[in-house]
């Protein structure tokens, strides 16, 4: 990879009008990549559980693979086994003292296994830095994987978050992402619901402020029969923040009886915010059920009057509503330590915004 190479990332699986500038996102990324710092348990060898996990596609697209090509970059591997009970894997990820860092984790859940993966992206020591991290997940038959990702990078520190996953028969994948940092975020998830009755449930919460950019791409491919996915995205944009959300649900031939739904709620609290949303539902199968919806707007006069009647000004009311939206999500983490970290980070970020 060349130094400061231009990459097209977060591509839509089916192109829309070019003038919308939503088919993909162009970023410049430094090719001089060094291993990121990850505090984790001792790695275990991933089993060959019916597929080569390394070949999975992530939601950020093929061009981003160049970032991870250096053989010296960090690769962690974990396996969850049914006899081990409910397993929790905690990863603290940072660029530390590097300007450009990257790493990968492979996680396989064997048949009937249950595992929770908690990834926290924390600020590096450099004021300007890039962190790219790739997570690949294989959920074996009747297994459950919960992936929880918390972004807390400071302003000037970019995160490229690449997630790829495959779900076997009756497997379940739950993804919860909280973007409560100050830096730009490029987030891509791709999931292959290959097994019959496999499921994906995704919840994303974010706050964008100042000049921050949030660019998200979710691609869910339904292959098996009676598969199910639901996507829920909730966030707030303030000041001159920019956000793009691409949500694609693709019902492949043979996926009869499958269902997919995506919903987004965006609170706009700045005159200069820029919000773009493109829900995409593709069908090659007749007997499927796909839906999408979005609620985008400001606080209405009735809500503001309610707060004003209680002596609460508009700015404070906006902060209360912003925090409430995200509190509902992070309480789904079901890990007391991580919930506390997110609550503290949210308070810190919102306090910074008011300065």
Model-predicted regions and their roles:
Residues 326-335:
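Short arginine-rich
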Residues 1-74, 81:
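Long, low-complexity, mixed-charge
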Residues 5, 58-305, 309-310, 333, ...:
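Conserved beta-strand/loop scaffold segments within soluble protein domains that form the structured core
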Residues 300-303, 320-327:
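Small/polar glycine-rich anion-binding or flexible loop at a beta-alpha turn
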């Amino acid at each position: 990879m060349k130094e400061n190479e231009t990459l097209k990332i977060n591509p839509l699986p089916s192109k829309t009008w070019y003038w919308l500038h939503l088919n993909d996102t162009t970023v410049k990324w430094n090719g001089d990549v060094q291993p990121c710092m990850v505090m984790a348990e001792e790695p275990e060898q991933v089993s060959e559980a019916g597929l080569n996990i390394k070949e999975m596609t992530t939601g950020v697209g093929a061009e981003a693979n160049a970032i991870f090509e250096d053989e010296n970059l960090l690769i962690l591997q974990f396996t969850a086994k049914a006899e081990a009970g409910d397993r929790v894997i905690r990863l603290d990820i940072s660029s530390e003292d590097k300007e450009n860092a990257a790493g990968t984790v492979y996680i396989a859940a064997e048949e009937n296994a249950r595992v929770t993966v908690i990834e926290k992206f924390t600020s590096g020591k450099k004021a300007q830095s890039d962190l790219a991290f790739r997570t690949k997940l294989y959920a074996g038959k009747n297994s459950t994987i919960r992936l929880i990702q918390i972004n807390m990078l400071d302003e000037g520190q970019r995160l490229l978050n690449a997630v790829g996953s495959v779900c076997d028969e009756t497997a379940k994948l739950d993804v919860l992402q909280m973007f409560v940092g100050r830096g730009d975020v490029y987030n891509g998830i791709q999931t292959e619901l290959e097994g019959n009755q496999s499921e994906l449930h995704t919840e994303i919460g974010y706050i964008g402020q100042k000049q921050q950019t949030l660019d998200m791409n979710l691609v869910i491919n339904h292959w098996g029969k009676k598969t199910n996915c639901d996507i829920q995205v909730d966030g707030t944009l303030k000041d001159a923040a920019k956000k793009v959300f691409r949500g694609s649900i693709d019902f492949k031939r043979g996926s009869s009886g499958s269902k997919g739904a995506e919903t987004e709620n965006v609170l706009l609290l700045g005159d200069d915010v820029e919000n773009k949303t493109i829900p995409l539902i593709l069908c090659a199968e007749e007997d499927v059920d796909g839906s999408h919806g979005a609620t985008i707007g400001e606080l209405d006069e009735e809500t503001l009057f309610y707060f004003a009647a209680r002596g609460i000004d508009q700015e404070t009311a906006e902060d209360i509503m912003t925090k409430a939206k995200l509190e509902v999500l992070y309480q789904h983490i079901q890990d007391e330590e991580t919930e506390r970290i997110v609550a503290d980070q949210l308070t810190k970020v919102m306090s910074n915004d008011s300065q």
